């Protein structure tokens, strides 16, 4: 008898869906997850903004109420009141999902790679897409560093040292993971995938510049090219999940929060109605993200100052809400904060006028 559900790909979205199914004692049939290397998830880090009533569901391991952006001497520092910045390790996500799968008699993780459509009542495809389908690429290299003494970094550096490049925007992401651990991650939003070796060298230079007199060691590295929108559709062998299914934010790459909620809703719908409602991003989010991607392609030199002004003019909670949900009200708040001339010219497609 064919499985009730077959999930192809066991990354964040595939395992999140499986874990959501595991919350039900009895399922209509078997649930299979095909993933040749589930341990890959353990090398990743997921960050997101959340409200206190979301803590139990999103399960942050590290939290911070302060975040900042900078370009040269210009700095915008936020302190959230309603929203907090949270981080969860891929290791914790993986271990939690594997425990849930192991404890459920009807769910099984199979170490296999599937490239053709399997037989099942419901099939989900969460495989990564080919990089040549990306509209814009977010390239990053991260190093997690363990210090012998407290590193003294109190705020999350969302986008520090922002500079325009020939192909987009480069910045460093600095994430405190407790008092003695720090994730340093040089990132590019780029029309041409960045060279990992260059980003890695910039990470090392950042550590020398800022912590040259401290003792530390690198305990983990991570790197990836992730999509910021798609210029062409990939061929799916099931209902698309994760980045493939539009669950990651085109303009930022944030996806953990959306994926967790979307996969939980999919599991509930299947259990109650045995149907899947297609995932759709809010229209306001699609519009805002496309505007930002067009600026990356046409006027990357204008982006650092635009982002600094937005961060300076928006309240911290409005900024966080826009980054996570982007409702029509969130978009209106963004437009009020953004510099009028660059956004108006971008809306008209007159990028040379910016």
Language-model features, listed with the residues they occupy:
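FAD/FMN-dependent oxidoreductases across multiple families
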Residues: 190-269
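Predominantly flavin-linked oxidoreductase catalytic cores and closely associated redox partners
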Residues: 100, 104-216, 229, 233-234
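A conserved beta-strand/loop capping segment in the N-terminal third of enzymes
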Residues: 48-104, 109-111
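N-terminal Rossmann-like FAD-binding beta1-loop-alpha1 element of flavoenzymes
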Residues: 2-31
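FAD-binding beta-loop-beta segment adjacent to the flavin cofactor pocket
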Residues: 166-169, 223-240, 250, 295-301, ...
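C-terminal helical "tail/cap" subdomain of flavin- and related membrane-associated enzymes
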Residues: 267-354
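N-terminal FAD cofactor-binding segment of flavoenzymes
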Residues: 20-24, 29-73, 141
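Conserved Rossmann-like nucleotide-cofactor binding loop
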Residues: 13, 39, 129
